[in-house]
């Protein structure tokens, strides 16, 4: 956004991060447009507690994109997506993915609709709804959740959206031993994958869960 330019160092950090993750450098311009829009709106609407654009690159964009190698083409519902994380970065990086951004907060949903419009993301749509109220049972190949509840809680509110054979991809910090043990009957962990996010010191794990 020309009226709210990001420092050159922000673009450099993103480009270096994409390179270290083996992702296409062509993703940088649309990701920076999204970041500039998020930074601008955040000043008024408090969409995220992270204010520094440099930190947003690491903790929002690169963290979201760390799961990209595990996402398949098809349909995906991003539950409790907030301002569109990881859903919008994944929609940018995966043109064969149809992303539904599920968020009940009105101001965050309005921001995402504007971001989708400005970015021309034909493979993303916003569902302003709580996950448990979304009447699209069995509609999705994949569910994602990055900062939403325990594994059992995610399954409880969003499990109905997953088609038979579909998977939940949940981003977690440290290895979630207790959460895995508390999954409802029929839900099984297929894999827990440690993730490396450039510039992020803390542990990150992607938990892949299959339904009954």
UniProtKB/Swiss-Prot annotation:
Leading EC class: transferase
InterPro entries (UniProt xref): rRNA_ssu_MeTfrase_G (IPR003682), SAM-dependent_MTases_sf (IPR029063)
Gene3D superfamilies, per database record: Vaccinia Virus protein VP39
Keywords in alphabetical order: Cytoplasm, Methyltransferase, rRNA processing, S-adenosyl-L-methionine, Transferase
Record-listed S-adenosyl-L-methionine binding positions: 80, 85, 131-132, 146
Source organism per UniProt: Stenotrophomonas maltophilia (strain R551-3)
GO molecular function: rRNA (guanine-N7-)-methyltransferase activity
Taxon lineage: Bacteria, Pseudomonadati, Pseudomonadota, Gammaproteobacteria, Lysobacterales
One of the record's GO cellular component terms: cytosol
Compartments, as annotated in UniProt: Cytoplasm
Function summary: Specifically methylates the N7 position of guanine in position 527 of 16S rRNA.
Alphabetical list of SUPFAM superfamilies matching this protein: S-adenosyl-L-methionine-dependent methyltransferases
Pfam families: GidB
Principal place of residence: cytoplasm
Gene: rsmG
Protein name, entry field: Ribosomal RNA small subunit methyltransferase G
Family listed: Belongs to the methyltransferase superfamily. RNA methyltransferase RsmG family.
Catalytic activity field: guanosine(527) in 16S rRNA + S-adenosyl-L-methionine = N(7)-methylguanosine(527) in 16S rRNA + S-adenosyl-L-homocysteine
EC assignment: 2.1.1.170
């Amino acid at each position: 956004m020309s009226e709210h330019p990001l420092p050159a160092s922000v673009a450099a950090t993103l480009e270096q991060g994409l390179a270290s993750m083996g992702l296409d450098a062509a993703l940088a311009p649309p990701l920076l447009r999204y970041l500039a829009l998020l930074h601008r709106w955040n000043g008024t609407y408090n969409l995220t507690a992270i204010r520094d654009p440099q930190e947003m690159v690491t903790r929002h964009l690169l963290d979201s994109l760390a799961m990209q190698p595990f996402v398949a083409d098809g349909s995906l519902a991003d539950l409790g997506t907030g301002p569109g994380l990881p859903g919008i970065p994944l929609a940018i990086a995966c043109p064969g993915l149809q992303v539904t951004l599920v968020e009940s907060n009105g101001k965050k949903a309005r921001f995402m609709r504007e971001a989708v419009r400005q970015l021309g993301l034909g493979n993303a749509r916003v569902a302003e709804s709580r996950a448990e109220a979304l009447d699209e049972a069995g509609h999705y190949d994949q569910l994602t959740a990055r900062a939403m509840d325990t594994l059992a809680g995610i399954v409880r509110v969003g499990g109905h959206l997953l088609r038979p054979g579909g998977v939940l991809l949940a981003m977690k910090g440290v290895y979630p031993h207790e959460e895995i043990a508390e999954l409802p009957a029929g839900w099984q962990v297929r894999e827990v994958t440690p993730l490396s996010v450039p510039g992020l010191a803390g542990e990150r794990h992607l938990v892949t869960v299959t339904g009954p």
